[in-house]
Amino acid sequence: MPNWGGGKKCGVCQKAVYFAEEVQCEGSSFHKSCFLCMVCKKNLDSTTVAVHGDEIYCKSCYGKKYGPKGYGYGMGAGTLSTDKGESLGIKYEEGQSHRPTNPNASRMAQKVGGSDGCPRCGQAVYAAEKVIGAGKSWHKSCFRCAKCGKSLESTTLADKDGEIYCKGCYAKNFGPKGFGFGQGAGALIHSQ
């Protein structure tokens, strides 16, 4: 198609792109309606685009197509390995430092006249010392990771089975298990 006006051509459809409908990326121009991932057809913007040659992708599709391949690379939760590396002599040890919460917290709250009971210590939690996390009221001093004891904030916690954890301990204890996950490259050393 001839380009009579001398304007820029869209990197996808090769038709003329006018200023009002133009999106620029890596020196190329695109129609707003053509600025889509080549694979999944999601709309792109400057924060979500990944370029390979003259093809444009969303970051997710780009990673799947051109990212690292092989064992242990993130293809999603459906493909995680449950191999613990035992065939390579790696031993997995369960931590026993878990301190369970008080199972009688609700009875304690009734006993003290309606104030909430702290799930960690079972004592009444009054407004001046109350922190809310995982849908429960905690003392500020009890609002700590159940594994490592690190102080938490309502935005930095993860909860499981009524207990609260820092993001690191939660990932180590309840995240994906298996060879190549969660320990970093130093743990992948194999010595004979």
Swiss-Prot record:
LIM zinc-binding domain: residues covered: 10-61, 118-169
Expression across tissues: Most prominent in tissues that are enriched in smooth muscle cells, such as gizzard, stomach, and intestine. Lower level in the heart, no expression in liver, skeletal muscle, or brain.
Single GO molecular function: actinin binding
One annotated Gene Ontology cellular component of this protein: nucleus
Principal location class: nucleus
Keywords: Cytoplasm, Cytoskeleton, LIM domain, Metal-binding, Nucleus, Repeat, Zinc
Signal peptide as annotated in the record: none
Stored Pfam families: LIM
Record localization: Nucleus; Cytoplasm; Cytoplasm, Cytoskeleton
UniProt short sequence motif Nuclear localization signal, positions renumbered to this chain: 64-69
Gene Ontology terms: biological process: muscle tissue development; sarcomere organization
PROSITE patterns for the chain: LIM_DOMAIN_1, LIM_DOMAIN_2
Keyword Zinc: yes
Entry keyword Repeat: yes
Record's subunit section: Probable monomer. Interacts with ZYX.
Protein role: Heat stable protein, that interacts with zyxin/ZYX. May be a component of a signal transduction pathway that mediates adhesion-stimulated changes in gene expression.
PANTHER family per UniProt: CYSTEINE AND GLYCINE-RICH PROTEIN 1, RHO-GTPASE-ACTIVATING PROTEIN LRG1
Domain-related comment: Glycine-rich repeats mediate the association with the actin cytoskeleton.
Name by which UniProt lists this protein: Cysteine and glycine-rich protein 1
Annotated source species: Gallus gallus (Chicken)
Lineage: Eukaryota, Metazoa, Chordata, Craniata, Vertebrata
